[in-house]
Swiss-Prot record:
GO process terms (BP): ribosomal small subunit assembly
Subcellular location: Mitochondrion matrix; Mitochondrion inner membrane
Positions contributing to GTP binding: 115-122, 162-166, 231-234
G1: region residues: 115-122
Cellular compartments per GO CC: mitochondrial inner membrane; mitochondrial matrix
Record-given protein name: GTPase Era, mitochondrial
Source organism (scientific name): Salmo salar
UniProt region (G2), positions on chain: 141-145
Protein's gene: eral1
Amino acid sequence: MAFRVSISTFGKSLRVRRVANVSAPLANASPFLRTGWAARPPGTNNGHGFRFTPACFITSDAFLSRLAKGKAETDDTHYHHPASVLPDSAEQLSLLVKDPDQPENSKVLRVAIIGAPNAGKSTLSNQLLGRKVFAVSKKVHTTRARALGVLTEDDTQIILLDTPGLTTPTKVKRHQLEKSLLEDPWNTVKEAGLVVVMVDVSDKWACNKLDFEVLKCLTQHPDVPAVLVLNKVDLLKSKSRLLEITADLTCGVVNGRKLQVRRVIKPPWAERRTDREARTSGSGDEEKPGGDVADGEGSEALSGLSKEQLRALKTQQGWAHFKDVFMVSAVDGEDVETLKRYLVVGAKPGSWQYHSDVLTDQTPEEICTNTVREKLLEYLPKEVPYTMTQAIDLWHDRENGELDIAVKLYVKKESHMKMVIGQAGQMVARIAREAGDDLSTVFLREVKLRLSVKVKN
């Protein structure tokens, strides 16, 4: 097992001569570690404080060797640029059913990305695809139904299954959410060859404990390999906390090996005091996000777990069967690039499911309404965007290549309509402008989007 530290993640911590030590067998370290680029910060002459290439992960030596081999083999090959979505529904459907143009020795991997609502699943999918095709916002339940993205590179096809955040039957009923938000994540994991579990480490109430619904999902499918992705690490002030979070969420075990994390710059008496404080704060954190635990037994039928298993999971903090751990941030694309390389190298021989020009299985109209909804969630307060509906009045592809779209927004109250329109129409104009810009990048053409608002009786 090896631990590699991202420059971007631990940049501030590197001002200290020695910050943290990860105890793990390094006698047979991977060649990837021995030959990879490394630099030693000024003033460190004792072997500690090395700065390795960006992208931080914990993984087995054997896989690191495969990762290095795969990277070396693909550095000089042709890169398949991200595809675009065809703006015509019939053409998009025709492309989806078109025979795959797979090469000899093709490889494929289906990846289910799961996590609590607002963990950053859709953002990660967009970064991996190299193009924004999934709606994202700071509010929960932006993703309402499962959709997939297709990443094709050389002889490998990665199918990303973007899912709604795992939720409970109680919350679905309370907030009048679609049934798909409850069922889609569970069904997706059944089809996956790899599960990516996203955790927002900037959420101080939940970062030390896996979401209860996530634990149930992992427990039901222990045979599906899973990796942990710690997201938004750039927002964490104390970078050394990442080590503690990793230990908590993995139960101190990664790829079947125990992970020992301890401070090395404090005297023993200070270390003992820190341990006591950590245990005290840890017990408090476990109680904070207990809302999902309360109705765990209500989803017994969906999860397929017995009441005894569900009760046991209530006291479980992490998952001891993660194969690897990655740390990513929205500000550093190199971290995501390493995760992408991991997926490509981990793909197995098999037939492609889609033509290499396919980017997503969403229809152009679905992408449009999801993009508009993203902006509504971003700029409108409280429950307003959740109660709105949309209808596409116009979809016209001009001869000059421009795409004209007109969408009617329906609200329930006059007061909501005033919020959507804004002062002198500034709010609705802003939403139309930003949504139109996003659609232009998806369809690779100029998009003129017009929005109108109406109170629905």
